[in-house]
A protein has these predicted regions:
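Secondary-structure boundary elements
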Residues: 1-42, 46-51, 105, 168-169
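Alpha-helical and coiled-coil interaction segments, frequently adjacent to or embedded
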Residues: 134-171
Length: 171
């Protein structure tokens, strides 16, 4: 039994790291195009891919919506300032995975290189406790099915914000 637990732990860590390494980039989301060959993605792409890979290996996975604040990340004020009509509080996609009969929060959003910019990066994950989350600030978690979006984000601002954020994160 202990050998099987170790094998599962190694597998979940390996899959987490595989998806975590994919560079973060805000871009169009099409669930049908998510596969192991994506070369970049945001929380939607990366959580969807990790969910698919984990379920393929027999893990129980739940989709989670997390409300976070972009202000809690190390993003230049000039980029945050683009959001004039839109709030900085946005919904985020993440996962819960059942590991050893316990639901564990697993967030693979930020690729390791973003640690240099002050983003919360999970390193050497133990495969059994919560990973670091999207920010170290205040977060609210919802089961995907229970989440009702009440946040009004203006599309033009969001697109400009995403464009500038992508430039900053890839620099």
């Amino acid at each position: 039994m202990e050998g099987r637990k170790n094998k599962m732990k190694k597998k979940i860590v390996q899959l987490f790291e595989q998806v975590q390494k994919i560079p973060y980039k805000v871009c169009k989301f099409d669930k049908e195009l998510i596969n192991q060959n994506i070369s970049y993605g945001d929380c939607r792409h990366k959580s969807e891919l990790l969910k698919l890979l984990l379920r393929e290996k027999g893990f129980e996975v739940k989709e989670v919506k997390v409300i976070f604040d972009w202000n809690d990340l190390h993003i230049p004020k000039s980029i945050l300032g683009i959001l004039k009509k839109s709030p900085t509080i946005w919904p985020h996609n993440s996962l819960k995975v059942k590991i050893n009969n316990k639901w564990v929060k697993v967030d693979c959003t930020w690729n390791p290189e973003l640690e240099e910019k002050g983003f919360p990066i999970t390193k050497n994950w133990d495969g059994k406790s919560d990973t670091k989350q999207v920010t170290e600030g205040r977060l609210r978690f919802y089961q995907k099915e229970e989440y009702v979006n009440k946040i009004k984000i203006f599309k033009e601002e969001a697109l400009k914000f995403a464009e500038e954020l992508n430039k900053y994160l890839s620099s």
